[in-house]
Curated annotation (Swiss-Prot):
InterPro entries: FloA. Homooligomerizes. Its main location: membrane. Keywords: Cell membrane, Membrane, Transmembrane, Transmembrane helix. It comes from Alkaliphilus oremlandii (strain OhILAs) (Clostridium oremlandii (strain OhILAs)). It is a multi-pass membrane protein. The chain crosses the membrane at residues 5-25, 27-47. Pfam families: FloA. Belongs to the flotillin-like FloA family. NCBIfam families: PRK13665.1 (NF010186). It is found in: Cell membrane; Membrane raft. The keyword Cell membrane applies. It comes from the Bacteria. This is Flotillin-like protein FloA.
Length: 333
């Protein structure tokens, strides 16, 4: 009985040790590679474990590349993986490029992948051109009419310029700039409506794909809409501004006139005050003249008579004016 227990313990320990060894040494992956025609040593796979590289991430794409007829080095794939690249995507791109008869080397594909580009998508776009649809672009012709233009740009990826080349946003911006320039040079918006292909030809001839990762194949005008009359709106705004300026100047003149009127009223009041002051000096002057003998008593009475006569005439004139005003009102009624 103790021998049986000892034997079971030994078997269990051996099983555990074997499980640990098999989990560390990818024997199954090595056998798969061997039967797939990929020559990779078992110690190479163990070395990947020590370098913290998952062997299936390297061996799987290598098997796929070998079956596709590509001759790739496992060290290059591992180096690309350690650099942070997507080995599977690079291998798929190389296979797609080979099928499409596009000359693409592993080093170039790896550089494109490490640059942050989707190398597989780039190969697919290089084979099957992609259509980029621009948003509605606002442009104004010389007659002041705003035109909304929507374009479709057919592009093909340029493998040689994928690293360092500008992306779709640059293509859209340049096409929009070309449309605005072309429409802005048109004498009338009717010319744009009659010949939309003139926009395509002129924009396409500007070489907008220079320095980008794409090659522009065609630019097609998808839609043209008439928007606002910018010229008339600007004239209306200018007229409104001129009116406000004129109103401001008129208000300024009115304020100056009111101020001048108030100044004149103040001057009149000041003059009246001087008259009253002068009239107050008359009795004093008469008294002084009487005391000094320069004015006789009869002269004084004559002055009093003249003053009384003047007061009476003013009263009669005022009564006559009031009667005339009353008579005029009765006639009006």
């Amino acid at each position: 009985m103790p021998e049986v227990v000892f034997l079971l313990i030994v078997v269990a320990i051996a099983f555990i040790v074997l499980s640990i060894i098999l989990s560390f040494i990818p024997v199954g992956l090595w056998i798969t590679a061997l039967f797939s025609g990929v020559k990779v040593g078992i110690f190479t796979l163990v070395g990947m474990r020590f370098r913290r590289v998952q062997p299936n991430r390297i061996v799987g794409p290598l098997i796929k590349a070998t079956k596709a007829g590509l001759n790739l080095d496992i060290d290059d794939l591992e180096a690309h993986y350690l650099a942070g690249g997507d080995v599977n995507s690079v291998v798929d791109a190389l296979i797609a490029a080979q099928r499409a008869e596009i000359g693409l080397e592993f080093e170039r594909a790896a550089a494109i992948d490490l640059a942050g580009r989707n190398v597989l998508e780039a190969v697919q776009v290089s084979v099957n051109p992609k259509v980029i649809e621009t948003p509605k672009i606002s442009a104004v012709a010389k007659d002041g009419i705003e035109v909304m233009v929507k374009a479709k740009v057919t592009v093909r990826a340029n493998i040689e310029r994928l690293v360092g080349g500008a992306g779709e946003e640059t293509i859209i911006a340049r096409v929009g700039e070309g449309i605005v320039t072309t429409v802005g040079s048109a004498l009338s918006h009717k010319d744009v409506l009659e010949n939309p292909d003139s926009i395509s030809k002129m924009v396409l001839g500007k070489g907008l794909d220079a320095g980008t990762a794409f090659e522009i194949l065609s630019i097609d005008i998808a839609d043209i809409d008439i928007a606002r009359n910018i010229g008339a709106q600007l004239q209306t705004d200018q007229a409104e501004a001129d009116k406000r300026i004129a109103q401001a100047k008129a208000e300024e003149k009115r304020a100056m006139a009111v101020a001048r009127e108030q100044e004149m009223k103040a001057a009149v009041i000041e003059m009246k005050a001087k008259v009253v002051e002068a009239e107050a000096e008359v009795p004093r002057a008469i008294a002084a003249a009487l005391r000094e003998g320069k004015l006789g008593v009869m002269d004084y009475y004559n002055l009093q008579n003249v003053a009384a006569d003047t007061t009476m005439r003013e009263s009669i004139a005022k009564i006559s004016k009031d009667d005339n005003d009353s008579h005029g009102k009765d006639i009006t009624k």
